Structures are given as structure tokens and as C-alpha cells.
A protein has these predicted regions:
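Charged alpha-helical initiation segments
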Residues: 1-22
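Inward-facing hydrophobic residues that define packing positions of alpha-helical scaffold repeats
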Residues: 11, 29-30
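Short, charge-rich amphipathic alpha-helical segments embedded
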Residues: 23, 34-49
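Solenoid-repeat scaffolds in large eukaryotic assemblies
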Residues: 25-27
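Charge-enriched, short contiguous segments at helix-coil
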Residues: 56-60, 64-103
Length: 103
């Protein structure tokens, strides 16, 4: 993917977040990269835009980001225990997120 300058900057932050072990920030930033690309990159191929919007892994990422950011009284998508006691699953999700845009 040929990223716009804005998306490239966000990707750099996502990589820095990942390297620092900030898994939640990585997931959020990777989705932000995709959001910027969809909104501003006029050179994206139509089929690729469709994949970004409806592809299984991209839908997973968008839904995961939304669950992390938006509160739901009935469920807790993340707790302090997830971050401080057992963050292995978050690390796996962050890695999966980054792989969507750098491979």
C-alpha cells in the first residue's frame, strides 16, 4: 500500500507503540491508518477499497478497535488485568493488526 503522508506518520507511531509494548495503542493506530487511507487516498483501487471495508481481517480490526474505544455497560472489552497481568492476547492482536498493513 502506498500510504499518504498522514497515514505514514500514524503507521510510524503504530510501530513505535508496538515496539514499546503498547498493544492497545497499536491496534487503535493501525485502524487510524486505514481510516485515513480510505478518507484521503484517491489512488486506491476500487477492489482494494472494498477489501479494506469488508475483508474479514479488516472488519475484525475495526470491530476490535471500536470495542476498545467505546464503552459498553454490559461488557468490558478490556480491563487493567488484561494490560498489566496477562497481555499476551493483546500482543497477538497488535501483531495481527500491524501485519494487515505492512505485509
Amino acid at each position: 500500500m502506498n500510504l499518504t503522508p498522514h497515514a505514514t506518520a500514524l503507521l510510524g507511531e503504530a510501530v513505535n507503540s508496538f515496539c514499546g509494548g503498547n498493544w492497545v495503542a497499536t491496534i487503535i493506530l493501525v485502524q487510524a491508518v486505514l481510516d485515513v487511507e480510505l478518507a484521503t487516498n484517491e489512488f486506491l483501487d476500487g477492489a482494494y477499497v472494498n477489501e479494506l471495508r469488508t475483508g474479514k481481517n479488516f472488519v475484525w480490526l475495526r470491530n476490535r478497535r471500536n470495542r476498545l474505544l467505546h464503552a459498553d455497560i454490559n461488557t468490558h472489552s478490556i480491563t487493567d488485568a488484561d494490560i498489566f497481568d496477562d497481555d499476551r492476547n493483546l500482543e497477538i492482536e497488535a501483531q495481527k493488526s500491524l501485519k494487515l498493513i505492512i505485509t
